[in-house]
């Protein structure tokens, strides 16, 4: 506390004991028995403490990491079927995060009294990617490639894994990526989105999961080299190589345009788990050609009709099939774990409608409960919804649009009808486009919306 005028106690001007600003230069000045602190210094101290907390390494124990059986059990609650893919993902994710427990703990940087790094400390060593070592054996990272038809659950599997492990998760669309310098998103933007997902906490981001969807859409257009540059196909694959394998990516800090003089954030992608997914439409034909029996002369066999389905063929996928499809060998080598998803049949689609925690029927039942009504979807209607989704070849994604279409008129009129007790969807509501049946509270009277005029 300073006193600018000692003649009169009422003329005393109070100063912050930390920054020296007067009470007229700050919004608030908090007093203690002997010192004062302003609101600006309080905010600064809060930020410093929060940064120190974020820098503390997270202590992982064996109990905190779920076993493959536990991971599989959690996936079963949200994803129906796909047993082979679940088992493959559970083992790969468990091994990946088990590997992270053996990473060397970061050394604390020596700072002087002003909070600046002490000269002479080895800065180059801190920028090298951290490697997991067990008994002098380096544990390499195993990224994952998901192959399956559209609507089979690839994205949902990745989202459920990230939610269970409580790690930063980001989805990227490969179709929007281009080489650096061209119109579109650079591959480094993926890491920037991951940082945004964890509030720019670099330590958390370096343990996150990145899901790159539609990876099959950046395949090479042809096997023959072209004169023109393929900036959205093979060029993107080349740009993804170092990012997927592990490199120090330079990402602009939060509010980069507002603070152009700030240094770029260095993010080590060595320990980020990359999951790439795609439908790979037409890959089954490549596999079919490779596995077809051939011969010469009298030993030649007439190729008959292959009765194997898409799911059976995709299980037999080999790296050479992916290369022929259009992925470059270097990228395939960096995605060693390949999990194939089966095409969903009618019974699986019915289970998806009713069994998971966030099943579609349960969601619409909750919506109608808000209006004071119940929703009943009969077994025949569930079967009709599944058959229509199979005919549209949209997989589980098509279920919502079909159910939404059948309930559109009901959800439009229901807020105005206060005496509806139950809404019933039967087979005719789906197959023939009929109106759902309404059961009123006053008397049991089945009436459809067409009678309301």
Curated annotation (Swiss-Prot):
Residues 109-127 have a biased composition (Basic and acidic residues). ATP binds at residues 149-156. Zn(2+) binds at residues 16, 19, 38, 41. GO terms for biological process: cell division; proteolysis involved in protein catabolic process. One of its GO terms (molecular function) is ATP hydrolysis activity. Residues 4-57 form the ClpX-type ZB domain. Residues 108-127 are annotated as: Disordered. One of its GO terms (cellular component) is HslUV protease complex. Keywords: ATP-binding, Chaperone, Metal-binding, Nucleotide-binding, Zinc. NCBIfam families: clpX, PRK05342.1. ATP-dependent specificity component of the Clp protease. It directs the protease to specific substrates. Can perform chaperone functions in the absence of ClpP. This is ATP-dependent Clp protease ATP-binding subunit ClpX. It comes from Polynucleobacter necessarius subsp. necessarius (strain STIR1).
């Amino acid at each position: 506390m300073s006193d600018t005028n000692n003649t009169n106690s009422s003329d005393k001007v109070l100063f912050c004991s930390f920054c020296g600003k007067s009470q007229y230069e700050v919004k608030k000045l908090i007093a203690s028995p002997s010192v004062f602190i302003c609101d600006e210094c309080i905010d600064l101290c809060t930020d410093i403490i929060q940064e120190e907390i974020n820098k503390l390494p997270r202590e992982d124990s064996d109990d905190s990491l779920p076993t493959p059986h536990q991971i599989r059990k959690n996936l079963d609650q949200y994803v129906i079927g796909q047993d082979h893919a679940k088992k493959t993902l559970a083992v790969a994710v468990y091994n990946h995060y088990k590997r992270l427990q053996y990473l060397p703990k970061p050394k604390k940087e020596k700072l002087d009294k002003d909070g600046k790094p002490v000269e002479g400390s080895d800065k180059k060593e801190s920028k090298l990617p951290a490697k997991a070592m067990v008994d002098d054996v380096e544990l390499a990272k195993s990224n994952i490639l998901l192959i399956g038809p559209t609507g089979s659950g690839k994205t949902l599997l990745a989202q459920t894994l990230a939610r269970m492990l409580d790690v930063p998760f980001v989805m990227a669309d490969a179709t929007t990526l281009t080489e650096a310098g061209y119109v579109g998103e650079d591959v480094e933007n993926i890491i920037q989105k991951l940082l945004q997902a964890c509030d720019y906490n670099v330590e958390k981001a370096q343990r996150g999961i990145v899901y790159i969807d539609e990876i099959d859409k950046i395949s090479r257009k042809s096997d023959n080299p072209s004169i023109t540059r393929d900036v959205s196909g093979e060029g993107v694959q080349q740009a993804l190589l170092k990012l997927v394998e592990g490199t120090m990516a330079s990402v602009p800090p939060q509010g980069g345009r507002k603070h152009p003089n700030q240094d770029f954030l260095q993010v080590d992608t060595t320990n980020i788990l990359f999951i790439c997914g795609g439908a790979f439409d037409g890959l089954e034909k490549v596999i079919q050609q490779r596995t077809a029996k051939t011969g010469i002369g009298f030993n030649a066999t007439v190729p008959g009709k292959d009765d194997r389905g898409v799911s059976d063929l995709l299980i037999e996928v080999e790296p050479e099939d992916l290369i022929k499809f259009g992925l470059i060998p270097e990228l395939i080598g960096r995605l060693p774990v390949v999990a194939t998803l089966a095409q969903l049949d009618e019974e699986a689609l019915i289970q998806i409608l009713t069994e998971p925690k966030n099943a579609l029927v349960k969601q619409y039942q909750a919506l109608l409960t808000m209006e004071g009504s119940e929703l009943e979807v009969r077994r025949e209607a569930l079967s009709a919804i599944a058959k229509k989704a199979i005919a549209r070849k949209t997989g589980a994604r098509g279920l919502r649009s079909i159910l939404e279409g059948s309930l559109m008129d009901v959800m439009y009129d229901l807020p105005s009808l206060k005496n509806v007790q139950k809404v019933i969807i039967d087979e005719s509501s789906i197959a023939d486009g009929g109106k759902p049946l309404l059961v009123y509270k006053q008397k049991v009277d089945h009436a459809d919306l067409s009678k309301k005029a």
